[in-house]
Amino acid sequence: MNNDVISPEFDENGRPLRRIRSFVRRQGRLTKGQQHALDHYWPVMGVEYRAEPLDLVALFGRDAPVTLEIGFGMGSSLVEMAKTNPQQNFLGIEVHSPGVGACLSAAHEEGVENLRVMCHDAVEVLEKMIPDGSLHMVQLFFPDPWHKARHNKRRIVQVPFAQLVLRKLQPGGVFHMATDWEPYAEHMLEVMSSVEGYENLSPTQDYVPRPASRPVTKFEQRGHRLGHGVWDLMFGRVK
């Protein structure tokens, strides 16, 4: 597995370009199980970054709806969704290799075959590898909220990102977001409502109840016990 999660970019004079990232690379130590999974299961389920469009039918060996999840953490929810929906294809992106290893291990243990994973910057993957109009759904669950005002620009949900996702969705495809930080939920709602080509799938034009398709994470369960809220947003690409 290539450990370069960001491709270097340069201006016309050869100077490195600085791009605002929505994540900080925190490489924790791999457990033996995670390393074993990367060594043995990555060749089957892993996808290396290349700056060229993916053939999604060839990647999965069939033509089926593709759900892309950005930042799957340790992968338990993603594996559960893939197992529950064998008629769909799932592609997960995560920049932290321990999470990728944990996801691969869980997928192997559950016998999941309709899942592929990447370890790279999701924005670059969307820009370079995902064909326009190819995705059934894009999922972004509990991204870093970047609480401090001076860091708000690092939030992944911004107008250019929403427009990028829109291009990659099929007509009628859905961008599903969830956050447990209300100011970020409000920010998401404001951004998404401003981008032409989306429709808010909430009857009240704000948030939706958690759909059954999104498993409740352990982190979320703990938050519920502490009285914390969670906000789900679903925006569809206008047909």
From Swiss-Prot:
Ranges for region Interaction with RNA: 150-155
GO cellular component, one term: tRNA methyltransferase complex
Pathway it works in: tRNA modification; N(7)-methylguanine-tRNA biosynthesis
Active site: D144
E.C. numbers: 2.1.1.33
MF GO annotations: tRNA (guanine(46)-N7)-methyltransferase activity
UniProt KW Zinc keyword: no
Residues holding S-adenosyl-L-methionine: E69, E94, D121, D144
A Pfam family recorded for this sequence: Methyltransf_4
NCBIfam families membership: tRNA (guanosine(46)-N7)-methyltransferase TrmB
Record note on quaternary structure: Monomer.
Protein name: tRNA (guanine-N(7)-)-methyltransferase
Organism: Cronobacter sakazakii (strain ATCC BAA-894) (Enterobacter sakazakii)
Lineage, uppermost ranks: Bacteria, Pseudomonadati, Pseudomonadota, Gammaproteobacteria, Enterobacterales
